[in-house]
Curated annotation (Swiss-Prot):
It comes from Drosophila pseudoobscura pseudoobscura. Adaptor protein complex 2 (AP-2) is a heterotetramer composed of two large adaptins (alpha-type and beta-type subunits), a medium adaptin (mu-type subunit AP50) and a small adaptin (sigma-type subunit AP17). The gene is alpha-Adaptin. GO terms for biological process: clathrin-dependent endocytosis; intracellular protein transport; protein transport; synaptic vesicle endocytosis. Keywords: Cell membrane, Coated pit, Endocytosis, Membrane, Protein transport, Transport. Adaptins are components of the adapter complexes which link clathrin to receptors in coated vesicles. Clathrin-associated protein complexes are believed to interact with the cytoplasmic tails of membrane proteins, leading to their selection and concentration. Alpha adaptin is a subunit of the plasma membrane adapter. This is AP-2 complex subunit alpha. Pfam families: Adaptin_N, Alpha_adaptin_C, Alpha_adaptinC2. The lineage of its organism: Eukaryota, Metazoa, Ecdysozoa, Arthropoda, Hexapoda. InterPro entries: Adaptor_Complx_Large_Subunit (IPR050840), AP2_complex_asu (IPR017104), ARM-like (IPR011989), ARM-type_fold (IPR016024), Clathrin/coatomer_adapt-like_N (IPR002553), Clathrin_a-adaptin_app_sub_C (IPR003164), Clathrin_a/b/g-adaptin_app_Ig (IPR008152), Clathrin_app_Ig-like_sf (IPR013041). Residues 623-660 are annotated as: Disordered.
Amino acid sequence: MAPVRGDGMRGLAVFISDIRNCKSKEAEVKRINKELANIRSKFKGDKTLDGYQKKKYVCKLLFIFLLGHDIDFGHMEAVNLLSSNKYSEKQIGYLFISVLVNTNSDLIRLIIQSIKNDLQSRNPVHVNLALQCIANIGSRDMAESFSNEIPKLLVSGDTMDVVKQSAALCLLRLFRSSPDIIPGGEWTSRIIHLLNDQHMGVVTAATSLIDALVKCNPDEYKGCVNLAVSRLSRIVTASYTDLQDYTYYFVPAPWLSVKLLRLLQNYNPVTEEAGVRARLNETLETILNKAQEPPKSKKVQHSNAKNAVLFEAINLIIHSDSEPNLLVRACNQLGQFLSNRETNLRYLALESMCHLATSEFSHEEVKKHQEVVILSMKMEKDVSVRQMAVDLLYAMCDRGNAEEIVQEMLNYLETADYSIREEMVLKVAILAEKYATDYTWYVDVILNLIRIAGDYVSEEVWYRVIQIVINREEVQGYAAKTVFEALQAPACHENMVKVGGYILGEFGNLIAGDSRSAPLVQFKLLHSKYHLCSPMTRALLLSTYIKFINLFPEIRTNIQDVFRQHSNLRSADAELQQRASEYLQLSIVASTDVLATVLEEMPSFPERESSILAVLKKKKPGRVPENEIRESKSPAPTSGPGSVLQNNVHVNNSHSKLNNSNANTDLLGLSTPPANNVGSNSNSTLIDVLGDIYGSNNNSSAVYNTKKFLFKNNGVLFENEMLQIGVKSEFRQNLGRLGLFYGNKTQVPLSNFNPVLQWSAEETLKLNVQMKAVEPTLEAGAQIQQLLTAECIEDYADAPTIEISFRYNGTQQKFSIKLPLSVNKFFEPTEMNAESFFARWKNLSGEQQRSQKVFKAAQPLDLPGARNKLMGFGMQLLDSVDPNPDNMVCAGIIHTQSQQVGCLMRLEPNKQAQMFRLTVRASKETVTREICDLLADQF
């Protein structure tokens, strides 16, 4: 009788030992080749191998493959092991197949049939081996071959729990590679109800599967919310016994609790049912209460499990952002963790508070921990925690604490880790600009940034300070004085030289009256830095010098000497040679008037999104709050360093800078360039000038139509035979600025010209409009401008009117026009995906939160035209959100001084009836009516 062999496989152990004892690569290859020859002879021999021998040789082949050698035989023997009833042999067969067999193998059909046989087995061990093999391979072929069998195993009442668990995980693996394999219909409900299973392994695996399914198809699996809330409540609440015996260091089912909390975060709002919402809130409160209880164990495993559930609950509270009480409690709990001795807890607390700082309900609570966060930034040993503290200070900053936070960040920047300095510089620059009430403070901050961390100040930052100084007349003298003083330091960073050269070249004349900063002193100070700078900075300084010739003719000779030195072979850089040579000739040949025209002061830069903010969003896309995307729109002055140098010498532009009327205007940072007076007597010339401004061809037949300005900001607002009125406007959050351009089309002056704002005191409490006075005489063929600023305090229904009166040929003229200041001008577009949009849409289903109108199309249905109008209305037109491609949906936030009002809109065309249905939903009743009234009959 043959001896009974165990599973030790002594031959395999000896072979592995021989390989380990090899002294060289050649010896190892020789031993492997010898073994391969032996295995090949055994497989091809006349003697039939038993299961043990096949298993042993297949294991050797597998080991050789794992050493990095190709295996081109033994596959059939491994497949034969699948039909064995012995676990160890079947296990090795599946292991070999999972590792070595690819889906293009000739044996794949035979393998699939063997797997199907095991799936139908009554032995749960064999079924599990088959499921594990399917999951390990996880190919499209496997998904298609077993898309029917695995779901049946998962929901069948006869399937053992351990098999259900494996089936759920196997299905999850296949779903990730082939999302279309999961059957719908009645299967959906049966899969969801696995959340009620009493087996810990089954419900945990099922939760992972359902979480993946919900991310792909949230509407179909929305029924899981009620079950997840119910199960979570039973686990957390002590009065229930659900899974209370599955405790990990006194924490009931912590992994399942975390998975259920993450599952619920796929929906916003989590649920619309009041009862379910109340139960969820009660559960979250219970979790927060348990966090306050004394620990039941001193072991770290207890605190880790307890805190894992707590932090996931806080994430759900932040995700919902609808329960002020829970948000405040979560903030207070996180505040306690800021002083915890565990580094990971402090990091997680700071990270969660970054999200809480963006909520209107908890922002003020987060600010209460400002001092502790500042200490974390300065004192933490771990750089990642210090980095997170900086992120939190950035997130909690507002107009009330901006100066303090910016100063603390500047102080820390001197000793900060090199890895976080560049990002800190960007954040300080953004905060200083965003919350500047006095732009002299902003200039001080940026110059300090350059002084402290000049190497980390990117081009976008120093471009930015130049733009702001050029666009704001009231800060130009201070900037010139401050940068002049900064340049006197013995060691001066090159970025400081760039800023100083640019600003002194433009505004050095503003400080030239002081003998300490006389023209020659300015020139010598800048030129003392010249030889220490890169060619790019030297080129900028040469441009500054030619500007000095225009500003200070008395030092022309000194500057021309410098140009002569660098226009010959003494300068190795071709760009510097050419620039110096051209500037020298310009200073010699050009008359004073020509020189003044060519080298006149730079005009205001156009307004775009802040390039600094764009850089920060690229570096930290997840940590820049969405509401900052439109915060700072003063642009980088150029697209690159070269263009700064080129633009420093500027040919005369027909536009001049618009003077700011008040502090609000300054903060807006808008630069609407007015057209200069036109002295021509030709009507057509005047109209052409306006056409240049507005980018459109206007003519004398234009009619007054304020409704078209619902969808545009610039254009001709009014025109008759005497007067043409153009408008150019810009808006940011709840602030706006309009430039009105009055053009006299007649051959005689218009006297007693007087525009008067018609806007009641009651309406001013909702929309505050300030208007700058204009000259009383509008000369023939001339154009003047008038600046208006607007601040939206709360939503309003009407728009202000301006009454214009003047005398023409002795006859009094008077008429009124509506200003394009409807409430939609204060929209901020909001990006949403389909899930978020319809979740929010359903949440705003109350009678007072919606308004609807059905109206006949004013002209044959023009869907592209309707889309273009909506794109200009101020809201974000959301593509691929509505299931009906003809429907148009939009989202936006109306910014007022008192609050922000979220608004959703849906426009549904009916091509057959030539009609539209317009639905507007918002969190404020008056807004729904106002937006609906504005848009009705516009299509």
